[in-house]
């Protein structure tokens, strides 16, 4: 397939248009530009300030808060409220019927983990427009699952989607890997890719890797994913490995707990917006802490408290079993029951 990408100003939406010339299928990615001066009180100067701050389209403005817009020089609270309200009207944000929501969920696609058992408890695989958390002790398989997801994104057989949107997803999909612990290994990506008959270097070329040494860098990289999308990259997978390690080392003690949780909440909100607006899969890995007072139930719990608990769509706890076997327990989901699955981690990657 030959792909043409046309750029018209700022990148907002990717509308695939298909045509056939001499039996070749062409996908024209038409990009529609939002004119910010359509918003009340926004002239060319204010529009430029909004773009410089990253608010390049109506949807991003519609999902912003008044406080965020007032950080831009020259925008008052009253003006920010007016701008946001107008953007929401243009984006048709508001109440929808249950049937409309059900129809919209047809755009959701799923990415296989590599294990049929694990896919089954997830309802078919890693779901787009969602944040999936994998928590567990060291060596439980969190980073391996993240690496495998990057490889599987380049394997059409491991993507489950309606025909109407599958071509969009398969149009040179790319992954973003935010590495906070220095555990990303390109050699492992190559090894997993070759096990599936893929070109390891080609898979690596479709992964954007960023090493975050503190929470500010981590949050900035997540926010900058939109810049990659605006540059024309078809980002369909975002990974943060791991979510809470930088926050734990920077905010020590109960005195800084509230500040840490607020910041972590903002980070999770960014990841949720990416998943929802751009229809991508978001994976976060998470560390655990011991529960010395636990008489019943698990002796470890995921870091992040209620902030992460409420923000993550699917929560899975991983633990070691015998040899190369691992056990995954789905313990939180909006629509799936609690369930366990066993999978293996070998040289070939994740499988049953």
UniProtKB/Swiss-Prot annotation:
Gene Ontology terms describing biological process: DNA recombination; DNA repair
InterPro entries: AAA+_ATPase, DNA_recomb/repair_Rad51_C, DNA_recomb/repair_RadA, DNA_recomb/repair_RecA-like, DNA_repair_Rad51/TF_NusA_a-hlx, Hlx-hairpin-Hlx_DNA-bd_motif, P-loop_NTPase, RecA_ATP-bd
Annotated keywords: ATP-binding, DNA damage, DNA recombination, DNA-binding, Nucleotide-binding
Keyword Zinc listed: no
Highest taxon listed in the record's lineage: Archaea
Keyword field contains RNA-binding: no
One family name in Pfam for this protein: HHH_5
Binding site for ATP: 136-143
Alphabetized SMART domains for the sequence: AAA (SM00382), HhH1 (SM00278)
GO molecular function: ATP binding; ATP hydrolysis activity; ATP-dependent DNA damage sensor activity; damaged DNA binding
Family: Belongs to the eukaryotic RecA-like protein family.
Function: Involved in DNA repair and in homologous recombination. Binds and assemble on single-stranded DNA to form a nucleoprotein filament. Hydrolyzes ATP in a ssDNA-dependent manner and promotes DNA strand exchange between homologous DNA molecules.
Protein name: DNA repair and recombination protein RadA
